[in-house]
């Protein structure tokens, strides 16, 4: 989206959206032509099997208090990313950056940093363990968010913004990997799909 908004400064405003639509068509066509896997067990699940039992299993494994704490962690662990996301572009514009700068430079930096962070997040979990990685990710995101205050009090500086965006996206990439591993560790094999869906909805 940021890239398309950047192109909007150079080309007609509607052209980037045509480009986005064309790219989305590739995925849609691939989805339509991909054969569906065969499922030999086509039995309709009851409400108890589909919803109540997975919740009961989760509470039983962790007890009510621990389950409540875990759900609170799940609900708030990526809260800053979720809140910051929609505010990013308006913030950059208010700070004096053009749509071209946001789309062609900042968003590219963010993409590269996120990919590196996702990769290193897996290495961090392997070396430090899941729970230490959770703490590291939380502090990294907290610090990277605070860095945006420097942008708010400074003159428009694309190099400074790129460094801070890189740091923020890198931290978010690590947190993304760690968060997925954390959620995976909470679900049981019997109710994997339902419990994972419920946890990611928080």
Region spans (language model):
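Juxtamembrane intracellular "pre-TM" segments in multi-pass secondary transporters
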Residues: 39-69
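Short amphipathic helix-loop junctions that connect adjacent transmembrane helices
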Residues: 86-103
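Helix-to-loop junctions at the C-terminal end of transmembrane segments
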Residues: 116-131
């Amino acid at each position: 989206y940021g890239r398309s908004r950047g192109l909007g400064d150079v080309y007609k405003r509607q052209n980037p959206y045509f480009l986005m639509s064309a790219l989305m068509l590739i995925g849609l066509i691939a989805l339509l032509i991909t054969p569906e896997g065969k499922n030999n067990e086509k039995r309709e699940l009851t409400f108890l099997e589909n919803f109540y039992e997975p919740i009961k299993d989760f509470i039983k494994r962790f007890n009510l208090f621990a389950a409540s704490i875990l759900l609170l962690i799940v609900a708030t662990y990526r809260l800053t990313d979720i809140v910051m996301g929609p505010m990013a572009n308006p913030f950059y514009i208010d700070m004096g950056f053009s749509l071209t700068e946001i789309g062609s430079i900042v968003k590219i930096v963010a993409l590269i940093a996120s990919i590196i962070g996702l990769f290193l997040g897996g290495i961090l979990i392997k070396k430090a363990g899941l729970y230490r990685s959770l703490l590291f990710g939380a502090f990294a995101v907290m610090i990277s968010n605070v860095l945006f205050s420097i942008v708010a009090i400074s003159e428009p500086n694309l190099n400074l913004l790129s460094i801070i965006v890189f740091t923020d996206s890198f931290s978010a990439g690590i947190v993304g990997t760690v968060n997925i591993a954390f959620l995976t560790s909470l679900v049981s094999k019997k109710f994997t799909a339902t419990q994972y869906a419920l946890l990611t909805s928080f």
